[in-house]
């Protein structure tokens, strides 16, 4: 006899006239298909959606920056003339710059009575401070009003990512318009290096920060000290890294196969149990009739 390759078929077909459809089996089959469809759509959504995972490590992620951090500052002082407003920068490496003007702009407010300062500058990766003050003015005012609103203060690249909720602009919207006009403001910043890596492996470097602040009127032996808005910063040694990941295709296929196979197996066992119990109940009823 010639070899019959069909012997390897483990999915033997049963003629339809030897099977018995039931209402219970139909209900279980419909529920089974709906359940599989629901799980399939859930897994498909998870497969398409990009997941962002984070990790912490100790290192300087942006070694190509030359030890610099880009800063973007946007602040309004509604009661201080633009010719009096200046930005000073100093740090522990000996930098001391008064009246920084590069990449900065002053926009008059309230018919010239106030000023909006917008600036981009770099700071060294060492503890230091930058402050908005009247120190660079030709003539110092007697009572400079340092009430203000901070629209933006950010470090490094701007990340437009909805999947992460970090404090990249923690001071954005800070309103000190009702504070003491003669008071100085100290913002103590702890800057945390942050790396965002997309699916293509491209990395962007930004910085989150936490902030604590205090308001005070300072005096010395010669009298009251001219107020200023201080941003004192220090860098954290811990780096936060966010990485975009998508579920591998093989895992998605494996999960779908498990869903389909597992659901049909459980549904088959349930249908068999219900059918067996139903047949047994019918036999019991027939026995009572006799």
Swiss-Prot record:
PANTHER family to which the protein is assigned, alphabetical: ENDOPLASMIC RETICULUM-GOLGI INTERMEDIATE COMPARTMENT PROTEIN, ENDOPLASMIC RETICULUM-GOLGI INTERMEDIATE COMPARTMENT PROTEIN 1
Localization annotation: Endoplasmic reticulum membrane; Endoplasmic reticulum-Golgi intermediate compartment membrane; Golgi apparatus membrane
Lumenal-side positions: 48-254
Cross-referenced InterPro entries: Erv, Erv_C, Erv_N
Claim: Isomerase is one of the keywords in the record: no
One Gene Ontology cellular component annotation held by this UniProt entry: Golgi membrane
Outcome of substituting residue 98 to E: In AMC2; uncertain significance
Positions in coiled-coil regions: none
Transmembrane annotation, as ranges: 27-47, 255-275
GO BP term (any one): retrograde vesicle-mediated transport, Golgi to endoplasmic reticulum
Topology Cytoplasmic: residue spans: 1-26, 276-290
Keyword Ion transport belongs to the record: no
Sugar-bearing residue positions: 74
Membrane topology designation: Multi-pass membrane protein
Signal peptide residue numbers: none
Lineage top rank: taxon: Eukaryota
Record's protein name: Endoplasmic reticulum-Golgi intermediate compartment protein 1
Keywords associated with the record: Disease variant, Endoplasmic reticulum, ER-Golgi transport, Glycoprotein, Golgi apparatus, Membrane, Transmembrane, Transmembrane helix, Transport
């Amino acid at each position: 006899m010639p070899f019959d390759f069909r012997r390897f078929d483990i999915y033997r077909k049963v003629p339809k006239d030897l099977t018995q459809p039931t209402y219970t089996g139909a209900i279980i089959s419909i529920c089974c298909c709906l359940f599989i469809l629901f799980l399939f759509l859930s897994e498909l959504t998870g497969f398409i959606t990009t997941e962002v995972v984070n990790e912490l490590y100790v290192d300087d992620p942006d070694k190509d920056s030359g030890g610099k951090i880009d800063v973007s500052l946007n602040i309004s002082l509604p009661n201080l003339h633009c010719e009096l407003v200046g930005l000073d920068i100093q740090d522990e490496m000996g930098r001391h710059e008064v009246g920084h003007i590069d990449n900065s702009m002053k926009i008059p407010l309230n018919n010239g009575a106030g000023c909006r300062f917008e600036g981009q500058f770099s700071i060294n990766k060492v503890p230091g401070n930058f402050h908005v003050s009247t120190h660079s003015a030709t003539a110092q005012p007697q009572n400079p009003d340092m009430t203000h609103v901070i629209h933006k203060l950010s470090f490094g690249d701007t990340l437009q990512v909805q999947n992460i909720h970090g404090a990249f602009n923690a001071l954005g919207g800070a309103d000190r318009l009702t504070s003491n006009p003669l008071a100085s403001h100290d913002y103590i910043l702890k800057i945390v290096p942050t790396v965002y890596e997309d699916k293509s492996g491209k990395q962007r470097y930004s910085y989150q920060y936490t902030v604590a602040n205090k308001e005070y009127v300072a005096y010395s032996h010669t009298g009251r000290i001219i107020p200023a808005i201080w941003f004192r910063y220090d860098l954290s040694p811990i780096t936060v890294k966010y990485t975009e990941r998508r579920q591998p295709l093989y895992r998605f296929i494996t999960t779908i196969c498990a869903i389909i196979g597992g659901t049909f197996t459980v549904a088959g066992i349930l249908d068999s149990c219900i059918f067996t119990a139903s047949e047994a109940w019918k036999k019991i009823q027939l026995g009572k009739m006799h």
